[in-house]
Amino acid sequence: DKFIGNAYRLEYGISMDKLHRGSNFGRIILETPYETLSYEVVVEKDICRDEEHRANEKEFNGILKDYLKYEGDKMSLEDWTEASIKKISHLREGDERNEFYLLAQAHICILGNRMDEAKWLLESYNYNRFAIGKDVELSSYYLYLTTKLSNDSIGQRRVAEELSRSFMKHPDSWRILCMLIEVDSEYKIYSERLNVLEKQFMEYKSHSLWFYLQAFRCFKEKSSSLKKLGQFEVQVLLFGVKYKLMTKELALYTANLASQMKNFDKHLYNVLVKCYEMYDEAMILTSI
C-alpha cells in the first residue's frame, strides 16, 4: 500500500522436497489493477554439467590408467593405492550420493590389500537384492566385490549364478561380463574367457580399458592362448603395446604368428613396430 516507485524486491520460497532432479520450471504472476506481470523461474536440482561430467570422467580414467602403469611395473601398488584413494575421495566429495564411487573406492582398497577399509565401505552400501533390476550393473558390482573379501566357495558360486542371470538379461553389459569371468569357474579356462570376450567385442564394440585388460591378461599370462590375429586379438594387442604391457615372450609369439599372415594388416604392423621399440629382436624385425 505504501509502495511508490518503479522497482520492488519480491521474496519467495521454494519447497525443495517438491523438486525433481534436473531443471524445474515455474512462473510467478503478479496482478495489479493496471497490468499482469509474469516472470519465469528455473530451479535446478542435482544438475551435473557437461564440463563437470567430463572432469569427473577424466579423473576416474586417471585411476584406471595409473593402474595400467602398475600392471606394467611402472608404478608400485602402494603408490597407486594412495593416489587412487585421494582421487576417488575427491570424486565422492563432489557427488556424495554417487554409490558407484563408493563401490569403486572399496575396489581400490581390495586391489591395494586394504581389506578392512574395503569391508567397512561395502557394509555402508545399501544393497537390496530385491531392487537389483533398478541398477543391475551397480548391484552386480557390489556382489562381485563381496567375493573378493571372502573365501566362501558356496557364496562365490551363488554370486556367479546371480551375475550369470544378470548378464543373460543384459548381454550388452561389458561390465557385468568382466565381473562374471573373474567369479565364474567356467571362465578360468583362457579359451572360454577369450571366446566370450571376443563375442562381446564383435557384437557390442566394447572398448573400455578394463575390458581390454581382461583380454590382454589372458595373452600375457599364457602366450599360447593367442591362437589367431583377427580384429579382436589385434585390438587387444594394440592396447597392450600402447600401455607398454607387452612382455618379451608375447611380443615374440605375436611376431611368429604375424610372419604366417598372407595379407598386410596396418594395425598388426603398428603392434609389431611398437613391440620392436620395446624389444630389439631379430624375429620381430623380420616379421615387420
Walk through the language-model features, giving the residues of each.
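Residues that mark the junctions of alpha-helical repeat units in TPR/alpha-solenoid scaffolds
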Residues: 80-81, 91-98, 105, 131-136, ...
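Low-complexity, Pro/Ser/Thr- and charge-rich linker/hinge segments at domain boundaries
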Residues: 40-71
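TPR repeat positional signature
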Residues: 102, 139-140, 177, 212, ...
